[in-house]
Amino acid sequence: WIEKRFREFLESKMFKGLGTERMVKGSDPHSPISQIAKKVHDQFVFIMSLNKTFIIKKERLKTAFNFLLPVKTFEELKIPLQVTATDIQTGEIQVYSSGDLLEAVVRSSSIPGYVEPTFQDNKIIVDGGVGLPNPVSILKPLVDFTIAVDVKRKIVPDLADLNIFEILQRSELVGYTKLLDNLLKEADIIIKPDIMNDHWSHFNLFDKFLTNGISAANEQLPDIISKLSKSNSWSNRFKRWFDQKTL
């Protein structure tokens, strides 16, 4: 159902209205934030002249997720879900696990500088990946076993045309990559699909991304089964129970 629905979405006017094909041209950046930096940079003067804080309205993203999500509240889900977002006023991580699922997912996907942020009380809420690129730490106390998926792009030596913008962008990339690597260490299993170092918005490569993701997961199956078996042992269960009680 998920794959079929997503393919329908890629052919819809809703998808075209998001403008993802215009995000990155030429030299693609790598991390979730720097991936959008090129787009923001190209329109910087225009945005500043209008005193704007985003390129596309939040409602466009909400319309897209309204089509993609089969349910609209956390309570309707068969498997519990934690959704994260970031308050860029304080840097605090916002975790949503009940109530309006659609609103939570939209907040978690609001790329700063591209999608309109959510203003609530004194908070300015944007993409969860800003403060927590991979939310293993959120799930660790709640589950017995964690599987993370690493789809970050590699740092490649492409700083031939050195300038201030490239230096700032590469500095952000290095910091993001190091943070993500440390976060991933908390996972029991890490699945690393071959994304061919392509930008995540290259939806024309959906079939390759899907195939490579399935392949990477299948390669990890023996390790997953082995570690799950050990994880379910009485001693490990007792240790996890004790750790949770002492948090």
Model-flagged regions — what are they?
Residues W1-L247:
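Patatin-like phospholipase
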